[in-house]
């Protein structure tokens, strides 16, 4: 595969720094997984290190050229590889008798939907390399410029840790921005609420607007004002001023009044 050209459309930037690969594997090993699912094994740099952990493994690769490379070079067997889109896969199908750890170097374009797919599955831990800016949005505090609907959604459901920053020179081709290794763990006793995410999108639709105004297409303003008052929140509050817990409590109070009990 000497003539292989990475796909810009697929956001392919392969990890070439062995120290980054080693640190990633050490983190994964410390989490004591029983099996591994890797999204985007690419040319197998991280894959080879993961296989040395001697755990049940399955990779999901969208690029047929890379899938062929992995098979021809006997990095993976056909049983260890799914050729397809990770966003369209049921992540629970690969190891029905155990709960695997999800990992991978994730293109920016699929970072959010892949986390959503992870949240909807039975999987509990996700170790991912993503763009630095995206990682910052995941951990952004209340009332900060990066505080967003998706960040709130993730913070409510997950324990999120930014493990270490990765310089762009660790990848080939070199991306324009740095990356970060993130660790996502599902919070115990927190049930997945998909409709909460859609509710949050409306809450943050226009950041400068009051929450009442952002939600007026879904609910009568008087109803929303009354619910805010019941929760000791001002009628002039904006979504970015509320914690994930406050926003979820608000969602639960308003849920019966949303269409079909949803948003």
From Swiss-Prot:
Q: Which reaction does this enzyme catalyse, per its entry?
A: adenosine(1518)/adenosine(1519) in 16S rRNA + 4 S-adenosyl-L-methionine = N(6)-dimethyladenosine(1518)/N(6)-dimethyladenosine(1519) in 16S rRNA + 4 S-adenosyl-L-homocysteine + 4 H(+)
Extract the GO molecular function terms from the UniProt entry: 16S rRNA (adenine(1518)-N(6)/adenine(1519)-N(6))-dimethyltransferase activity; RNA binding
Lineage top rank: taxon: Bacteria
Say yes or no: keyword Transferase present.
Answer: yes
The reply to whether Phosphoprotein figures as a keyword in the UniProt entry is no
Q: Which residues bind S-adenosyl-L-methionine?
A: 13, 15, 40, 61, 85, 105
Q: Which GO terms describe its cellular component?
A: cytosol
From the Swiss-Prot or TrEMBL record, state where the protein is found. Cytoplasm
Q: By its UniProt entry, which InterPro entries does this protein fall under?
A: KsgA/Erm, rRNA_Ade_diMease-like_C, rRNA_Ade_Mease_Trfase_CS, rRNA_Ade_methylase_Trfase_N, rRNA_adenine_dimethylase, SAM-dependent_MTases_sf
**Where is coiled-coil annotated?**
none
Cited function: Specifically dimethylates two adjacent adenosines (A1518 and A1519) in the loop of a conserved hairpin near the 3'-end of 16S rRNA in the 30S particle. May play a critical role in biogenesis of 30S subunits.
Protein name as it appears in the record: Ribosomal RNA small subunit methyltransferase A
């Amino acid at each position: 595969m000497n003539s292989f050209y990475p796909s810009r459309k697929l956001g392919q930037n392969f990890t070439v720094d062995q120290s980054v690969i080693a640190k990633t594997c050490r983190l994964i090993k410390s989490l004591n997984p029983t099996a591994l699912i890797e999204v985007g094994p690419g040319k197998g740099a991280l894959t080879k290190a993961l296989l040395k952990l001697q755990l049940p493994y399955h990779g999901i690769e969208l690029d047929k050229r890379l899938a062929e490379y992995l098979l021809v070079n006997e990095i993976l067997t056909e049983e260890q590889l799914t050729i397809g889109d990770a966003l369209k896969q049921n992540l629970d199908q690969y190891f029905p008798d155990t709960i695997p750890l999800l990992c991978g170097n994730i293109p920016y374009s699929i970072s959010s939907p892949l986390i959503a797919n992870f949240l909807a599955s039975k999987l509990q831990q996700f170790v991912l390399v993503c763009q630095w800016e995206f990682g910052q949005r995941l951990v952004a505090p209340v009332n900060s410029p990066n505080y967003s609907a998706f960040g709130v959604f993730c913070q409510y459901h997950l324990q999120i840790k930014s493990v270490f920053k990765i310089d762009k020179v660790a990848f080939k081709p070199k991306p324009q921005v740095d990356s970060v290794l993130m660790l996502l763990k599902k919070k115990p006793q927190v049930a997945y609420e998909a409709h909460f995410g859609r509710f949050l999108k409306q809450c943050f639709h226009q950041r400068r607007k009051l929450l009442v105004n952002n939600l007026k297409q879904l609910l009568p303003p008087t109803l929303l004002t009354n619910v805010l008052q019941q929760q000791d929140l001002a009628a002039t509050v904006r979504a970015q001023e509320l914690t994930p817990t406050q926003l979820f409590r608000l969602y639960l109070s308003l849920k019966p009044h949303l269409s079909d009990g949803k948003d």
